Amino acid sequence: MQICAGEHGGQGGRGAEEQKSMGERGERSKVSGIQSQEELDVYKLAFEAAMRLFEVSKSFPREETYALTDQIRRSSRSVCSNIAEAWRKRRYQAAFVSKLNDSEAEAAETQTWLRFAMECGYLSKELGQDLYQTYDYIIGKLVNMISNPTPWILHRHES
């Protein structure tokens, strides 16, 4: 049974040429035009996936309320909240990367709960695999940001 997308997709932001040209112009970061985390593709994907999981989990059995249902909702929402925290900590690279790592871990945890939901028959294989691959893509985008945080970090202008 193949459940993974195979490769962590994701473009993690803008291309190298755009990063280079923005850096040469002396802008504060490659994301200077973005006002909030809600404008980030990875945040949008994570939020949409968490909402899909919330809707789907409404049909999970009552006996799973405190085990599977609460856990999958919590971890999927935590992906978004950790991205939001990372966004607000862009002045400090270590804190930014730490929060992105937390978000990545929550996405991986969500994938684990998805596997349980599929194996227990609460999710169809098709829907479960689609959601799993969505989180695989989210993880890929987060890994790209973690691997190259500099363009995302706010830098002070030297006058």
What would you call each of these model-derived segments?
Residues 1-159:
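Amphipathic alpha-helical assembly/interaction segments
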